[in-house]
Structures are given as C-alpha cells and as structure tokens.
Amino acid sequence: MPYSFFKYIILINFLTGACSGPKQAYTVRELINGKFKADSSYIYSIPFKTGKNVFVIQGYETSFSHKGERALDFKVKTGTLVCAAREGIVTSVRKDSDKGGLKPEYLSEGNYVIIRHADSSTAWYWHFKKDGVLVNEGDMVTDGQPIGYSGNTGYSAFPHLHFEVQGRDAAGNYKQLATRFYTREGAIYLRPLRFYRTRR
C-alpha cells in the first residue's frame, strides 16, 4: 500500500470528532449537526472556480489537526486554482517556500495569502505551491478572483487548501469564526467528509 494512501486512511479515521467551542451565536456541535439559529453573518463563496466539486477533508473542530480550531481543509490536487472567497485587500503573502510535511519545523513554511475584508475580518488561505501565489500585498481582489494554485507546503500531510476566517465574535474578541458558504443547498456551514459544488 503506498505510504500516501496509508496516511490518507489514517486521517479519515481521525475525522469523526467534533467538540463544542467558544460561542458565536451557536456551538460547533450545533453547526455540525445542522442545528443552528437564524444567522445574519456574511455568506462566503467556496474558494475555487465556480462549478468545481470539492471535498472537505477537515471541518470545524475535527480531531486530526483542527481540534480547537474553526478552519476548513479542502482536499484538492496540487495546482488547483484557488479563488478569493470574498472581496478585500491583500495584506500579506508568502510564495517562496518549497518545504512541506508533518515535521514541526514545517509549521512556518507554508505559502499563504491573507485578505482583509470591509468589516475588518481576514481570510487566511494556506499551503500554496512554490511560486503559486498570484497576488501581492496591497492588491484589491474581488470575490472569485484567482489568487493562487494549491500545493502541499508547510505543515501538511497531502495537497490541500486550508481556509479560515478571523474576526470579532459577539463579545468583541478577535478569533477564528465559523462561516457560511453559498452551495446548491443554499447558505450553509460546510461539514467534513462531504463534497460541495462551488457557486456564487
């Protein structure tokens, strides 16, 4: 059995846990079970080309590497076009790394893009391939604009895109936020181990 496939099977076995985290207007368990209240939060686009089917390999609070985190991992091939999930201004990028793996020293080696939105929240996109970032600091980007090509740099077991949004919660604290996305089923919170089709 190829080692990469073995790692993938191990990861699947970890992706079943979901524990409650700090409240926004709901708990993570409520999100994962599809039980949440009426919500007025911003609706994001899944960060890929419109019409693409993508697989969410890790969701909020899943136990492989997202325990305590409100972040999503999309399992995609290296070189998959990544698009902005919301318009904003690019505040930071890295594009020169070619290092990746599960060693602690790779935690700071991922290529990334950070985009600040009109409400001061920021979207973080991680693990782009070397020289695969298409934007620069200070660029204005629109929803759906290409920003780079996915890869496997940084702390990563396989090619994927790590996506998270950070902003103010109901108490005014700056932290990771669970976010809704446009899908064929409407505006929903994405759940792990499911396919979704990108739409805008």
Spans of features found by a protein language model:
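Surface-exposed, glycine-biased beta-strand/turn segments
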Residues: 20-110, 191-200
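Acidic, glycine-rich catalytic/binding loops that coordinate metals and/or anionic ligands
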Residues: 27, 32-33, 42-44, 139-142, ...
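A residue-level detector for short acidic-glycine micro-motifs
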Residues: 58, 92, 127-130, 149-152, ...
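A structural signal for short beta-strand/turn segments enriched in small hydrophobics and glycine
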Residues: 82, 88-90, 138-150
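Short histidine-centered loop motifs in beta-beta connectors
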Residues: 121-144
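Flexible, gly/ser-rich surface segments that form the specificity/activation loops bordering the active-site cleft
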Residues: 93-105, 145-161
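C-terminal motif of bacterial Sec signal peptides marking the signal peptidase cleavage site
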Residues: 16-18
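Sec-dependent signal peptide recognition
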Residues: 2-11
